[in-house]
Design a protein with these regions (language model features):
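Short cysteine-rich clusters marking metal-coordination/redox-active sites
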Residues: 73-76, 90-93
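Short loop/turn motifs enriched for small/polar and acidic residues
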Residues: 32-36, 65-69, 108-110
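Internal catalytic or translocation cores that form aromatic/hydrophobic pockets or channels
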Residues: 60-62, 71, 80
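Long, charge-rich boundary regions
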Residues: 106-121
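Short functional micro-motifs and their immediate structural scaffolds
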Residues: 81, 98
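Cys/His-enriched microdomains
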Residues: 71, 88, 105
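Flanking scaffold residues of small Cys/His-coordinated metal-binding clusters
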Residues: 67-68, 84-85, 102
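Long, charged N-terminal interaction/targeting segments
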Residues: 1-59
Length: 121
């Protein structure tokens, strides 16, 4: 379960940013998770509950936004629906598709106790 190491990294990054801004605690961590990652959302949420203990994020809420996978043909530019079509090559020209979105994880922002200001990480 690699979600625990990812959750620990998320907490460490959020905590470092919060400390840099003089925060005493973190209330919210907003995450964008690509649907084409190998990360299981429920496992990540469970791992976050463990990873946040005894940190500035001890009482933080994790909000996960799922980013849909978007693919595009680098040759002809066609953007098919990868979930509906379940394809690895362009339906128009047959060349391989390149993934444009939905295969990464991004810590979008955190909210901390200092004046309830949210800032990007």
């Amino acid at each position: 379960m690699h979600e625990i190491s990812i959750a620990i990294s998320i907490v460490e990054i959020a905590e470092a940013s919060a400390r840099k801004h003089g925060a005493r605690s973190i209330q919210l961590v907003k995450l964008r998770l690509g649907e084409f990652t190998t990360i299981v959302q429920e496992a990540l949420e469970f791992a976050f509950e463990i990873a946040r203990q005894d940190t500035l994020a001890a009482h933080a809420t994790l909000v996960v936004e799922i980013v849909p996978m978007v693919v595009r043909c680098s040759s002809c530019g066609v953007i098919p629906n990868p979930v509906r079509d379940i394809i690895l090559s362009c339906p128009q020209c047959g060349l391989p598709l390149e993934i444009m979105a939905g295969e990464d994880i991004q810590l979008e922002y955190i909210e901390a106790e200092t004046e309830n200001i949210a800032w990007s990480v």
